[in-house]
Amino acid sequence: MLRIIDTETCGLQGGIVEIASVDVIDGKIVNPMSHLVRPDRPISPQAMAIHRITEAMVADKPWIEDVIPHYYGSEWYVAHNASFDRRVLPEMPGEWICTMKLARRLWPGIKYSNMALYKTRKLNVQTPPGLHHHRALYDCYITAALLIDIMNTSGWTAEQMADITGRPSLMTTFTFGKYRGKAVSDVAERDPGYLRWLFNNLDSMSPELRLTLKHYLENT
């Protein structure tokens, strides 16, 4: 059993307003569960515009610490961009699998958001009525369908997927600096000096950024 987890937050720094999960058992999506959560900070206008969860909707809801035990009980937790959910959630007693990292490994060069992959891979999944993209349970169904597709295509076991998740992977776009939002491959072609400057001057960098810069500097 693999448990797909999704959170909606007050912003990029965290503050959970909703958590949901579904389980994938024998290729089927089962056991849906979701909770609205009282956050530890105000919801940013930008986040509210995306998930449409308001302060009034969560004002009387339980804290995440009171809700999270409902989501224990799996050896494997799965999320799309799992590093984010893992960072904002309390410690979960299991191994993590990231479908975004798996998709990057399996299908290089395509867009990796869960909805982009849903469309590109032509996934067929029945989402919950009354919900929409960027509600936690809705996104769990999309990620679960993606996970099933990844497993059917690759033949990877949970152990292999967790191993891939734990390794650095190439970044596809810059998330900072003057080329924020631009494809790394395009920047490497147009301005390789910028990559060289980053590699030589950043005091600290993530393993993914180091791997990406080294890859493009050695191959362009």
From Swiss-Prot:
Its cofactor is Mg(2+). One of its GO terms (molecular function) is nucleic acid binding. GO terms for biological process: DNA replication proofreading; mismatch repair. Its EC number is 3.1.11.-. GO terms for cellular component: cytosol. CDD domains: DEDDh. Keywords: DNA damage, DNA repair, Exonuclease, Hydrolase, Magnesium, Nuclease. This is Exodeoxyribonuclease 10. It comes from Escherichia coli (strain K12). The gene is exoX.
